[in-house]
Amino acid sequence: MSTLQSLIIDGFHGNGFHMIEEYLQQKESHVPQKYNHLLLHHLDRLIKEELDKNEFQNCSLLLKCIQRFFRDDPDHEEPLLIQQGLIPKMVSWFEIITGLLITKVLASEALLTNALEDFLDTALIISRHSRKATVQMLDSFILRLGFLVAEDSVKPSIQQETLATLNCILNAAPQEERRKLSSAEGACCLMKELARTILTVGDYSQQVALSEALCRMSVGRQRNDLAMQWFENTALAEAFKKIKNREFETDCRQFLNFLNNRLGNQRRVYSFPCLAAFADGQEMRKPADEKLEEFWIDFNLGSQSVTFYIDNAESALWEPVKLLKEAMVKFIIIENDRIKMFIVYLKQPIVISKREAKKIEIHFDRQLGILQASIQALGEDKQAPSFQTSVLVKLFSGLEKEDGEIPGRCEREAEDAEESTLLPELVDAEADRCLITRCFNVQTVPGVSKGSLEITNTEERSLENSKQDEPEQVTSEYDYPLDMQEPSIQNQASDLNNIKEDSAFARDREQDRRMPFNDRNHDLLESNEDSSLSTNERSWTQNHKRKSLRTYSQRKKQRVSSLRILPLSPIRSGHAPEKDEAELVPLWKGISRRNDSTLLKISETKLRGSSVLLTSGASTQKIGLEKPERRGSEPSSSTKKTRVTDGLHWREPRSPHPSSGPSSLEYLEVEENIPEIVNRESFMGNSSFKHKLENLGHREIPDGSVAALKQSRLEDAPGSPVVTDTSTPSQEDMPGSVNGSAFKTAFENFTRDLKRKFELELKQREIPFSLEKAKEAPACLIRLWNQIHTCRLDTLERFHSSVLRELSGLEKNLQTLKCLEKDALASLLFVLSLGRERTFSR
């Protein structure tokens, strides 16, 4: 078998790179590679030649070869490549790549970006395997990495990767070498540039990484002296000096909130504390940290994204969630007199806590100005138009309060739940979505978390001694922007007023910091120092005002629900989840919350497997449904399942009639101006629909259940769109012989009579709304009654369409055969005439 060096030499002599690519696809052997002093010479010549020819893919292959040399020989003290001068060669390669990045023609080249990523990966691997190489990187390579981060013309994604590599190399460097670095002239200029970039970068995660780089480059008491040089504003410098290594993540949150607020209208990041956040109905929990009081959501103007961190049940690292503008279909903001709901619809599902989600819903206090921040970060083009928002307001303002019973819950928990009125949300079939929110009375001072930088005890002691007289927490001037106000953008969704004011949050354990960027782990350790809170801090857990609701510590222990996890999207780092279970902590038990969310229709949508084009102008007819008031208990329903099919999120079709409270059914008349989304034929095979039928069989269904008849689309709603598998031919398209035939007339009469028979059978079972029995009709039965009737009419309509289509085809085929018959007869006569002419000629 050829060695890797021999393959590189073959590529040097012009034999191509395909053999190298095949070699790299093999599994790592971890057997030391054999190479000599000529390897570095060949690598240097090849990489520079490929960069000059803009063959960035070949350059990536050569960089991966260097990675293989170090990975296959992890125990070697100082590899030969380092002794021969690999780091200076890499500096020259990096200068060429960064020069190409600044060039506008090649800046968007994907292969060039991949080559830079491979270069950064190579530098990271070398720093992990060679102490000498890490020290050499501090002299020159670190400075070039830092100035690339500060370059405004570089894309944010490249800046973020470069910054992550910079921090990892600094983390691997010895403390004494970092102390020397901070006193060098070039490093001082770099640190001032990094501090300036914090003000303009426009992305919270990059602001954190820049602050981390400054903390790593300044050791001990040097940080206090240098901070006054980095920031012209004395208040900012004093705030930065309050960042402690062992409480870096939460102290940095306080500092950045203070910094962004002081920038006023020039700020590039807006941070707001949210009340609750959901991904396709599943609660996303705040990271479990004693000092992190608020669940922060960041609107980033620079990267045009919304980012936040959530609790990771299977890791000490926080899980990052990033919603990019280009990944969104639309976003809407719905406001009532208590909260604001920020809802994002995504083009493709993203993986959050090992589950795919296409809709992200975040609740804020109504005092916060999230409208202005969201428009500045995402653009007005991503905000849903007013007519679509008004439709979604009706759907998200309490349509799901009809169903409140979850099978299998004990009666005591159900009685406790009846006294509380919660925001209606979706309940998965296999996992209750737990509503874990914070109190409405938002704090002015954000909390801090347990993230820490990896430092020695000597360095930490020196930092603490230098700050003996300083308060441990940033004062109350670290406010999130409460002054940003905007008027209500939609009708008030009154049903949202019943959201729970106080709730509890479980602190499972202390955690480190955010997720690593690719395989660039920042090696942040948990802190063992005193975690006592200052006087201006409060515990996340609140006492409930309603005595029927217990605190979180008094509730049942956590349960792990086995979930059917959808396939995960590929990630660059290659780290895949190891378990197929997601940890769910149900806080509100015995309560079913449903969210009949209709997928947002922005433009014409063609459903797979359907021959009908759905447009935003489609509308169904106006129907009314009178629901007498029900006393005593909440309506019952079964849990609902959701599944992703062909990229669309299918849900069980529901009646569009909302309920204004958890224990009453009132008369409502809803204007259905929503496009048809689900093919009527599909919901009969839906597992959720079958689950509902099974659950109904175990309940007592009172006689005389009422459902308002939905008129047939064949006669009463000719202008409404009908989602069927085939389109009905119009009378003008039908041949005249078929239209006037006795069969056609008889078939039309048959269809009409059968339709009327269906409606008559339903009317015979109808109970007047004024009867007492009608008040006992479950909401699910009323809805199911309407769906059965509609399905019956749709089935008849499809049959009607198919017969007419077959009649049309039959007429055309007969006409074609008739023409062929005439042609055959004419040909026969012509042949016979030719035969007679030959006979006479003889």
From Swiss-Prot:
Localization per Swiss-Prot or TrEMBL: Nucleus; Chromosome, Centromere
Tissue: Specifically expressed in oocytes.
UniProt entry tagged with the keyword Nucleus: yes
Bias type Basic and acidic residues, positions: 458-470, 505-525, 624-633, 643-655
Keywords: Centromere, Chromosome, Nucleus
Composition-biased stretches (Basic residues): 543-559
Region called Disordered, residue ranges: 451-473, 505-560, 619-666, 715-738
Cellular component GO terms held in the UniProt record: condensed chromosome, centromeric region; female germ cell nucleus; lateral element; nucleoplasm
Chief localisation class: nucleus
Phenotypic consequence of gene deletion: Reduced fertility in females: acceleration of the age-associated decline of fertility in female mice, due to progressive loss of oocytes. Males are normal and fertile.
A Pfam family annotated for this UniProt entry: SYCP2_SLD
InterPro entries (UniProt xref): SYCP2-like, SYCP2_ARLD, SYCP2_SLD
GO biological process: negative regulation of programmed cell death
Function according to Swiss-Prot or TrEMBL: Oocyte-specific protein that localizes to centromeres at the dictyate stage and regulates the survival of primordial oocytes.
Sequence similarity: Belongs to the SYCP2 family.
Protein name, per record: Synaptonemal complex protein 2-like
Species of the source: Mus musculus
Gene name of this polypeptide: Sycp2l
